[in-house]
Amino acid sequence: MSRADEGRLIHLAKKREREKEDIEKQLRKLEEDKEKCKVGITSKFTANYETMEESVKSKTYGLVSLDDMKNIQKNEISNRDLQVARGASSSTSLAKDSQEAREKEEHVAKHTQKRVLSFAYEDEEEDEDAAPIVPKKRVGMDPTVDTSFLPDKEREEFLRKKKEELAAEWRVKQNTEKNEEITVAYAYWDGSSHRKNMKVKKGNTISQCLARAIEALKKEFTELKACTPENLMFVKEDLIIPHFYTFQDFIVTKAMGKTGPLFVFDSASDVRIRQDAALDYGESHPAKIVLRSWYEKNKHIYPASRWEPFVPSKKYGRNFDDLSDL
């Protein structure tokens, strides 16, 4: 705290003490006025009563009849009422003065309380007398400091809008790609291969592909006439693919099977992304469509013995037993 602030506080404290003394003097004066009013009223009524008694006694000297006594008392009472009526105006003015004094006392007390609780008004009054406050110098900022880690609303809003634009662009691109047609090579497997081709969209599911395969094969294979997609299995690269996957899921992620990519439809596809003895071979293996009942009967026999359910998080590759079959 500076010396100017200390002097200012001392000045304000002295001023409050003076105001407090003035208020106490006013309160004492009001109390004295109240006491005087009470004494004046009491003495006035007592004096009037004693004066009336003395007047009656002086006028009833000696023996007086009852009627005369009553008339004298009646006259004295009427005289007293007249005096009281004359003094009513003075008592009314006195009560009015007392009420005004009470209101003034309340106003002074209220004003004093406000002055005690608030320093703002007093500070404004003392602005001219107080010494000027010297503002502190602000340290300059270094423009070479990296502030990218600090929060920036404008930058965050820009990044948020950019992410939304990229996400919308990606969704539009995915929807466009899902509507593209591809040719899928498949073979109905009942112990021997019956290869065919069909055109589907990248966004079609494996279940939709199986339904179309049933329509194409049921004329040739009678066991498929009453068949549904749930009765069939879709096997690709020795992996049993669940029916809810789409072709787009495997194309985008470039999922690999045991013997190569699950689905590659590029003109120059990198069919093998592994360095092993089976790199060079012809076209990709066609998908196998198999009855579940046939698989349950023959799953211990090659090639069904090598099939296993597809797990997205698992990395597939050829092991020693697979290479020995080549």
Swiss-Prot record:
GO terms for cellular component: nucleus. Residues 76-112 are annotated as: Disordered. Residues 97-109 have a biased composition (Basic and acidic residues). InterPro entries: FAM50A/XAP5_C (IPR048337), XAP5 (IPR007005). One of its GO terms (biological process) is chromatin organization. Disulfide bonds: none annotated. It comes from the Eukaryota. Belongs to the FAM50 family. PANTHER family: PROTEIN FAM50A, XAP-5 PROTEIN-RELATED. This is Protein FAM50 homolog.
